[in-house]
Amino acid sequence: MKRVKLIDVLKRRNLSSIPLEIAQYTSSVKSDIPLMESVIEINKAHIVMLTKQGIININDASQILKALDEIHLDINLDPRLEDVHMHVEAYVIGKLGEEVGGKLHVAKSRNDQVATAIRMTLRIQLLGVIQALIELRKVLLTRCEEYLKTVMPGYTHLQHGQPTTVAHHFLAYQGALERDTDRLMETFSRVNLSPMGACAFATTSFNVDRKLVAELLGFNGLIENSIDAVSARDFVVEALAGFALIMTNLSRIGEELILWSTSEFSVVTLPDEYVSTSSIMPQKRNPGVAELLRAKTAHVYSDLIAALTILKALPLSYNFDLQEITPHLWNAYEVTLTSITMATGLLKGLKFDAQRWLQLASEDFSTATEIADMLVREHGIPFRTAYAIVKKLIHKMSSKKKKITDITPEILSAAIMEATGKRVQIDKATLLKALNPIESISAKHVTGGPAPIEILRMKNERVKKIGVDEQWCQTRLLSLKEAKSRLHRLIKKIERGERV
C-alpha cells in the first residue's frame, strides 16, 4: 500500500519545517500509542453521528470511514504531529484531500477526543486487572481447602500471637483482594462515561447527538458538563489509587513469603522458577519475584503521586499538563497486571511444611490467651486477673528456658495461689486442651474465626462471590462488544449509501 504523506494540518506546513527538539518535547505520540485503537473508533462513531444528523453527506462519510479503516495498517507516528489525534486527521486529509478529509474534525476537538480515548482504553485495562484478580483469588481459595487444618502461629508485630491456620491466613489475603476487585468495579462505572460532544470545552453550535456517540462507543452515559468532560482526570487518579492498593496488598504477600522462605522460618518452599541463585553462593534460593512485588509497588505509588501533583492547582479546562498523566497510568497498569500474574504463580506453586508450622505454633507461647480464657470459663476468674497470672507465669517459664507445654496443673495452680491467695484445682485434660494449638483453633468457630467449619463456610461464600464477579465482567465485555457491532453495522450501511 502506498504510504500517505503527512503534513501539519494545523500549521499548514511540511513536518520537516518544525524544529525536532521542540516537537519531541511537546509531543505525546509515545504515550498515545495505547490510545490508537480507541481514537479510530471514536472518529468512526463521530462520523456516523454527523451523517445521521445531516451534518455531512453519506458519500463523504463513506470515504472517511474507509480511510479510517486503513490507518492502523499504514500510519507512521511522527512527534512533529504532536499527538495521535493529529496523525489520524492528517492521514485522512492526506488520503482524501481537505475537501472531504477536512470534514472529519467538524464538531469535535482533541480535548473531548483524548478524554474519551483514555476512558475507553482504561476501561478495558480495568476489566483485565479485575479478571487477573479473580484468578488470583481462585488460587487462594483452592489452596485454602488444601491447607484447611495446617496450623501456624498467627502474628502481631511479627511476634507469635495465637494459633491459626494457613487457610485462615490465605482467606485474609483473599478478603483484601476481593475489596480491590470491588473498588475497580466501582471505578469502572465512573470511567465508562463519555466526554464526546464537549468539544474544546464549550460544546458546539452543530446539532450533534452526544448520547448516540456514547452508545456507539459502549459508554453507560455522559460526563454532562462540557468543561468537566474535557478537564477531568480524577478517574485516572482513582484507577491509579486502586492499582496502588492492589500493589500494597501484593507487597505484603511478597514480604511474608520472603520471611517464611528463610532458613529461620523454613516453612515454605517457593517454586523453582520464581527464585534465583547467586553467582558465587551455590546454595542460594533468592526469592527474586517476591522481592520485586515489594519493589515495584514503589513505581505505582510514584505514578499515583505524579498524577496528583500534575493535577494540583490546574485551572480549568484543558492544559498540556494533562498529557503528562497518561504515561503514569499506562506504567501503573502494566506493573499491576504483571505483578498480579506473578503473585498468582507464586501462590499456586509454593509448598508449605505443615510439620514445621505446627512445631513453631506448639513451641512458643501462642496458646497463652487460651489458658487465660480457660481460667475465666472454668473457674470464674476475672479476665484481667487471669491475664496477669498467665503473663507472670510465662515470664517465669521463659526465664528458665521452659516451653508452654511444660506447664502442668500444679504449676498453674501455684501461679493462681500466688496471685490471688486462692487454691484452684486445675483439670489436666482441660489444661492440655488449652495448650494444644489444634484444639485452640477448633474452639474458635465464631464468625470469621479459624475453625475448619468456619473456614469452609467462608471459602464457599467467597467462591460464590467470585462467580458474581466473573458474571459482572462478562456482562461488561458483552455490552462493549454489542456496541462495537452496532457501530460497525451502521458503518456498513453508510458504505452502501444507506441512511442511518
Q: Model segments located where?
A:
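Charged/polar positions within long, soluble alpha-helices
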Residues: 48, 52, 73-76, 93, ...
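Glycine-rich cofactor/substrate-binding loops
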Residues: 2-42, 281-500
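A helix-coil-helix interface module used to build multimeric assemblies
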Residues: 2-203, 208-212, 274-277, 288, ...
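Residue-level "edge-of-site" marker
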Residues: 63-64, 227, 389, 410
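A short structural micro-motif
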Residues: 66-74, 233-234, 392-397
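Charged, flexible cofactor/metal-binding loops and thiol motifs
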Residues: 118-119, 126, 130, 145, ...
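Short, well-ordered beta-strand elements within core beta-sheets of diverse protein domains
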Residues: 46-56, 121, 165-168, 235-245, ...
